[in-house]
UniProtKB/Swiss-Prot annotation:
NCBIfam families: argB. Keywords: Amino-acid biosynthesis, Arginine biosynthesis, ATP-binding, Cytoplasm, Kinase, Nucleotide-binding, Transferase. Homodimer. This is Acetylglutamate kinase. It comes from Salmonella paratyphi B (strain ATCC BAA-1250 / SPB7). Substrate binds at residues 43-44, 65, 157. Belongs to the acetylglutamate kinase family. ArgB subfamily.
Amino acid sequence: MNPLIIKLGGVLLDSEEALERLFTALVNYRESHQRPLVIVHGGGCVVDELMKGLNLPVKKKDGLRVTPADQIGIITGALAGTANKTLLAWAKKHHIASVGLFLGDGDSVNVTQLNEALGHVGLAQPGSPKLINMLLENGFLPVVSSIGVTDDGQLMNVNADQAATALAATLGADLILLSDVSGILDGKGQRIAEMTASKAEQLIDQGIITDGMIVKVNAALDAARALGRPVDIASWRHAEQLPALFNGTPIGTRILA
């Protein structure tokens, strides 16, 4: 069975209750299903907290964090360090054998600089599946941060949705984007069960989908096109529904290519 990538986002890393629910769902799923799982995570809330403590400005452009050269070390420490190891600690607590990685390990995801204006922000492209497939074959849960490295050794901060998309293409995996929201909402705050590219463009033009959600929707659309299969956007808040989601039952918004 092809692997499933679960991309974690939002304030999940700040909530012990959410992490407990998520890892309980992961344990239950792994006990009853053989499907290999991979976690990809960002950690914007961890970065924001650290930047605030250091009195450093947080600047975003089109939903992407501007990352100057003097901040990439701090952001790497927050994402590949604190956020990644927090998730590994929760996996350990729940007796799940896990391995912490970043995108550059085993050249799993290739990264180039997105553009000069954003600084150390990377564009993710599919890489080599060898390392992660080896870990999956041996029963490990890879936990991958959204920090990458260019061919000339420059660390890059990669949007975690886009990192997960590139890794899904690398592994031929299905993809779920878990966030704070239960899916994409229409103008009345109602969840949209299915979303096509034309519907997404319409809602962006109307100002209903904005900021970071535009990046999330575009990443999901890119993933659906690249993978040739639907991608789910859903919430981690409903833990009891997560095993069904991991098994292919939509509970949020299903993005169609």
